[in-house]
Amino acid sequence: MERSPAVCCQDPRAELVERVAAISVAHLEEAEEGPEPASNGVDPPPRARAASVIPGSASRPTPVRPSLSARKFSLQERPAGSCLEAQVGPYSTGPASHMSPRAWRRPTIESHHVAISDTEDCVQLNQYKLQSEIGKGAYGVVRLAYNEREDRHYAMKVLSKKKLLKQYGFPRRPPPRGSQAPQGGPAKQLLPLERVYQEIAILKKLDHVNVVKLIEVLDDPAEDNLYLVFDLLRKGPVMEVPCDKPFPEEQARLYLRDIILGLEYLHCQKIVHRDIKPSNLLLGDDGHVKIADFGVSNQFEGNDAQLSSTAGTPAFMAPEAISDTGQSFSGKALDVWATGVTLYCFVYGKCPFIDEYILALHRKIKNEAVVFPEEPEVSEELKDLILKMLDKNPETRIGVSDIKLHPWVTKHGEEPLPSEEEHCSVVEVTEEEVKNSVKLIPSWTTVILVKSMLRKRSFGNPFEPQARREERSMSAPGNLLLKEGCGEGGKSPELPGVQEDEAAS
């Protein structure tokens, strides 16, 4: 039998080294499938490969994790200093040209779009690395997100699509349960998720100094989560309620001017916010207030939104929103009421109507008059404005345009606010913009999230705080106004969920 020239010329010592290396590598990689390391014929001694593993293990211990679905995943998760970084050997990425094709392709398995970090509580979605939790609410949580491409931090709100579809803004609320849609209705009815995408496309195009900017939205089709990326405002909410040191009257006036301009801009875009309150008003670096958190907002058609559902925070709800009459009510007037409650909080550090029980709170909102404490003393003009904003009749309640002209707001005309035409321009979106309003995360991101849960030995939502159920309540503000700090920079979340109270679902 003839032997090939390559085999005849092979050094016996090299052949021995090859066999020893094959046995050693097989022992180290017995849990992985793949090509036999000895097939290359020039493997170095096993100590060369071991040296590339031990230093990495000393500086960054390899976490012990269960294998989930495929070998690709374990390769993607391989820590720094592993055999993928060896300069020689069957899995090296060095200049050797005699490696097996399968071994050569292994480094390309690692994705730069979706990956999971070895650090605790860190998941990466596309270019965003999710870090600590900075807020929470009834519809999801807010996490600090680091954009590696831009070297910049954002706030990523993780929302439940099921809850979003139930409460998110539609042109009209769906009919009551059990009723059927009328025959011969509108020519085109958008699917629920399409309606959400349409409104997201509008929110992405909103551009106003007093409205928080929505950067982009990521969607994982295989999961319930929807990820909204917002500008990060590190100064946080304008105030936490209750507050022992409320704002001076002049500071409250300046903040109200910002809120009214932002609210007028939203109404111009045919959006009602439905959850105006101090924790949803964030301070920018320039000291101006920005309206945030559109989790229960509504888009409307015509001159005003005609609403029939209850949403928002109980202590900030208008009487008509909690009425048992079943009649529809104005969305714009709803926002004015909530802004009036917010203004009251600014100067008194608490809500005008307080009770630990939801039914008692509703009764006070609908029936009791607004009471002004003796301290701190405020001007009669401010009291007049608050009473007009907290008019229990939405038909006679003051509107945004009249608030802008109120003597307390303008200092009797000395500081007029810009007209609607000067600071509002209607945003229109095309079908293409609606189509591209949400970026889809590759479906195998689900596997990454599952791996994160397995690593934490928890099968719950990795973004959901454990104490959420303990803090949820329908009463307000008593048990719901958890924090007592106030003032600028009380905390550093952008778009926190709900702190005065969680939005009612």
Curated annotation (Swiss-Prot):
Q: Where does ATP bind?
A: I134, G135, K136, G137, A138, Y139, G140, V141, V142, K157
Q: Where is this region: Calmodulin-binding?
A: 438-463
Specify the Protein kinase domain's residue ranges.
128-409
Q: What is the name listed in the Swiss-Prot or TrEMBL entry for this protein?
A: Calcium/calmodulin-dependent protein kinase kinase 1
Q: Where is the active site?
A: D275
Q: Which organism is it from?
A: Rattus norvegicus
Q: What is the effect of changing R172E?
A: Loss of substrate recognition and interaction with CAMK4
Instruction: List keywords of the entry alphabetically.
Output: ATP-binding, Calmodulin-binding, Cytoplasm, Kinase, Methylation, Nucleotide-binding, Nucleus, Phosphoprotein, Serine/threonine-protein kinase, Transferase
**Catalytic reaction annotation:** L-seryl-[protein] + ATP = O-phospho-L-seryl-[protein] + ADP + H(+); L-threonyl-[protein] + ATP = O-phospho-L-threonyl-[protein] + ADP + H(+)
